[in-house]
Amino acid sequence: MNRVLRCLFVLSLLICGAVPARAGDDRSLERGAAIIDPAILRELDQGRLGLGRLLWPERSVSLPLPNRELFGLPSMLPVREALEREFDRYVGRHKASLPNESIGIGDDYAFQLFDRGLFESPDVRFVLSGIVNRMDRAYVAPASCGEIRLIYRLTRTDMPPIGENAVSQRLPMTLNLVLKARGDADDASVTCREIARRWLAARNSPPMVGKLFGKDGPLELIGPANIDRIETNLQIAHAPKSAVRDFRTDYLLKVFNYDRAAKRFAEAPMENQIDRDRVLADEGLRRDFKAWLLDPAHFAEFDRGTLLIPEKFLANGAVAPTPVGFDVSDLQPEFGLVQGEGTDKALFSENDVVGALKKAAADGTRLQNIQSLAGFERRLNDVTCAGCHQTRGIGGFHFPGVDWMAAKPSNSTVVPASPHFFGDQARRREILASFRDGKAPDFSRGFSNRPQLRGSTELAGTEYSDGWGAHCYLPGAKPTETDRSFRGWTCAEGLACQVAGQTSRMGMCFIKSR
């Protein structure tokens, strides 16, 4: 393992292993857009928001739904079958590209696979580990006012925590049940403004299940009728013993839309997950995608982070390798699409991007993020599902979730969400406030590496923005050597940007050396 990746790996252990010392002072970052109180989640999981109650509402018993029953449901069979196909493809690709690296279940293998037998185990189930308000995504489907996400973590139930500080036996897979914030059957009085008001009002009172589900509560309006899709994220393999992929871990991402007429989930294209290999290999798709993305209106949305790429360019699944480091590499989902990325079939040249920037300036379009070829390249990766999950995550997760089954859940040292998640809370709450106040929300977002300046006061000095461990950019000795897309990525006082790549000036904020 090279020095940079070793540093990243150690840092990830530090982030995963302990809550920052001032976490108690930063509770405001968590409030208003997420429910992560352990006691509340326990009660909700055992009640109305247990996964079985939502996916099988006709079930006569309220007992938790183990995987054996979950993946046996007619609605979930397509999910199980699609995951099985992805496993087969992954193993096939591995054997073709790394024939000397063993792959299988258990410690004896160089690449250790996720055990597919867990899908039919009676001793494993998905446990509610967080509820996240994503009304900041209302630009995708305005009539639904965005989304409410119920995030469940796969957990063993046959191994109760033993010991004063024990944690539960959680497994590296999450299931995200995505609900419409405003259901199709809701009456006209249920507006985006009203839903946002309820969520923000919940910030000002102690969390209680009765209030959350009561009249005017933020959860009163959600139920099985709101289900839109399922998103799965699992650690398909990790390589602690590989001679060529030291500490490499791969995460499989999938999306399944709910077909209400058929009462089944169906494999679906992933939002903005560009099918790189297919697009590069097809002249028609190459031509169409290039023209579509460089169109001034689409380019402006691309800069703002609100772009929705047509499905014909998208993939139905993605594998996100971690860690990827700070340099451009073939581990990134869109490597090869931009000139200079090691291929002679690049889709976008520097002249293409410069031309789009000049056209935006001439039209009076104010771009917030993309000011250079490198900015275009970074945005092309972080609008994808895989690219976002590779950036400031905990492994390949942005929300590994609350462990309310731990012996002392309120004192658990497990971080429920990633720096990217917490750094985005100020933006999400501002959007909720705009909805509540009857204003047009600003849905734009910065790069996944750094939050927008709209939360600069609240985030200043934290690891979420410019504090210790934050992502940064080291300016060049001359102004002409500084990339305009990243010149604001500085470090807080007392810290310096330590470059962590071989070919870029990206790095992390650490204490200044003497």
Regions found by a protein language model. Give the residues of each.
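Sec/Tat signal peptide C-region and signal peptidase I cleavage site
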Residues: 19-23
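Secreted, cysteine-rich disulfide-bonded mini-domains of extracellular proteins
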Residues: 457-514
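The canonical Cys-X-X-Cys-His
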Residues: 382-392
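Short, charged low-complexity linear segments at domain edges
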Residues: 347-371, 464-477
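Primarily the internal scaffold of c-type cytochrome electron-transfer domains
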Residues: 392-441
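Bacterial N-terminal signal peptides that target proteins for export
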Residues: 1-8
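Conserved small-residue
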Residues: 24-358, 420-421, 427-462, 495, ...
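Bacterial N-terminal signal peptides
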Residues: 8-16
